[in-house]
Structure formats: structure tokens, C-alpha cells
Amino acid sequence: MLNDNRVVRPFEWGTEFISSSSNNADPRYLFEEFSRTTIATSDEYFALPANESDVEHELTDRNEQRLSWKSHVKSVSSQNDLVRARVFPFKKNKKSAIVVVPHWNARAGAYFDLCRVLNRVSMTALRLTLPYHEERMPPDLERADHLVAPNVGLTLQSVRQAVIDTRSAVRWLKQQDYEKIGIVGTSIGSCTGFLAFVHDQNIDAAVFNHVSGYFADVVWKGLSTYHVREALEKEISLEELRQYWLPISPMTYMDKLAAQAPRPQRYIYTLYDLTFPIDLSRDTMRELRLRNIKHDEVVLPCGHYTLGEKPWVWIDGYKIVRFCQNHLR
């Protein structure tokens, strides 16, 4: 793996991102309480406000649309708070649309090929730009270091923003009269997509590409986030971090998902993944089975990054597109 401009940033609690009046309280206590109360009221935490942001449209030379709107979550950067998306419309009907949520540090243009393949099989695709990525990245960053950070509170806020931005995209598609909405998320986009899926009944089907139940464990054990762990482990244990980041962990909401009416959901993971280690994926699958949550499972014999290379990217794409075809058309 290339060590491309990864920077070990200082550890920070970031209590200001969860409380406006910490009053010099022990940050561990603040995050324990925040985690407990947020999980109990997660519908409110991930709620989409009733007031809608104005969505601006710009047509590209390929008759695709660039969208932008103001995020419902105010972050540390006004540049980040202007959400960006690209729409690849299927013009013959509005039977189905897919929200595509990319991986961490995805580059401009990533997933455009997938979106155009979805077009070819009669589906509209909306490719979302994650917080602190691409046009949303502040000038002082080279990587999206505020989305997954050694800052406990900032990471919570950033993932919440990603989820609410995703739900905003779903609502916009519903307002355009699409009959069925799906979501395809990869890596951190899988986590974001899962959180949106559990909290938004307007999403009819989902594909989660790379799977883990606990946000903290991926950061702690994954190869891609070694630089984040290096800062975290000086001040905090994995067990503590797992507790504090439960509000943004899919495993937290398994019972909530089990209580809902079944919706088609496919989980894709790889045997030799060093970023989402295989034991984390298997633990998640086990919890789905224990709760009798109907789901589809695909395991590919490659690694995290090789999933984006031939021939695995073709197989992965086929598994994504075919599932969407079967359940959203």
C-alpha cells in the first residue's frame, strides 16, 4: 500500500462537536453519556429536517447534472457544507434511482463508470460527494482527514453529516417522482449507507460494499487508517473508542433493522481485506443471521484495494448492478 500523504495528526477529544457546554467535564463521561442518549434517540440524531435546502442544477456536456445544496449539518468548514452530487439520468422512465456513496478519499470521477452502467440497465444514478472530499475539501487538507480523524467528536459530526447528506439526496430523488430508491455504498460509504438505510424507509434496497459492524475497530485494526490509530492509541483504548463511536456503528442498529419490514440488502466483502479485516465482516454477518434479518451475502477471494482492480472490479460491479436490477426495476 502506498503511503500517500498520510499525516499523523494530534489526538483531540472534540467535545465541542457534541456539547456546547462541557463545563470542563471529564470528556470520557461526556462521550459515554452522548453515546447512550444518541443511540436511544438515533431517529432524531440522523433526522432530515423538514425545511429543504434549495438544490442548484448545472447541466454537463454529457447531459448529466451537477447538483449542489447546503448541508443540514453545519461543520467547521463552509466549503464542506455545500453538498455536491452528480446525476446520471435515465430519461425514458422514473422507475428507479440509486444513490452511490463512495469510499474514503475517493477521487473526482470515481464511480462514474458504475453510474453509467446503471444507466445502461435503465436506472438513474446519483453519485454523492462525501464530506471533506473533492470540491468540499478545505484548502488546508490534502486528504479527507476530518471525516475519519483522531478527533473523537469531529468524526461523529462528520459521519452524521454524511448520513444526513445521503438522506437529502434520497429525498430529492423522491421529489423527482422516482418510484424506487436504492443505495450502493463502498467502504465508509457502506457504513454511511447502512446508517441511512436503517433510518430512512424511503430506501427500498441496498448494497453494502465492504462490511464491518464497529467503526472504531476498522480504524484501529485496518491498514489504511494506521496513521489515525497512531494518534488515538496514545490517549484512548479500543474499548473506549468503540463505546464512543457506537452512534456511527452499524452493529448498534441491528435490532432496529430486525424490527423493520424486510428490504432487499446485499453485503459484499473480501477474504483478504486488510482495511476491513475479515473477522469484522464475519461478525457482522453472524449478527444478521442471529436476528433472522433476511439478506444476501457475497464473498470474493481478493483484498480491499484489489476489489477495485480487474477482474474483481468487474465481478463486484456485476454483483451490484444485478442486485439493483432484480430489486428496483
Would you name each region that the model predicts?
Residues M1-H72:
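N-terminal targeting or regulatory segments adjacent to alpha/beta-hydrolase or S9 domains
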Residues S78-P89:
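A short loop-to-beta-strand scaffold at the N-terminal edge of the catalytic core in hydrolase folds
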Residues R84, K94-H103:
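Short beta-strand element of the alpha/beta-hydrolase
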Residues H103-R160:
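Cap/lid segment of the alpha/beta-hydrolase catalytic domain
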Residues K174-S187:
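Alpha/beta-hydrolase fold nucleophile elbow
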Residues F194-E239:
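Hydrolase active-site cap/lid region
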Residues K221-L280, R286:
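The feature captures the conserved acid-bearing segment of alpha/beta-hydrolase catalytic domains
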Residues R282-R329:
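C-terminal catalytic histidine-bearing segment of alpha/beta-hydrolase fold enzymes
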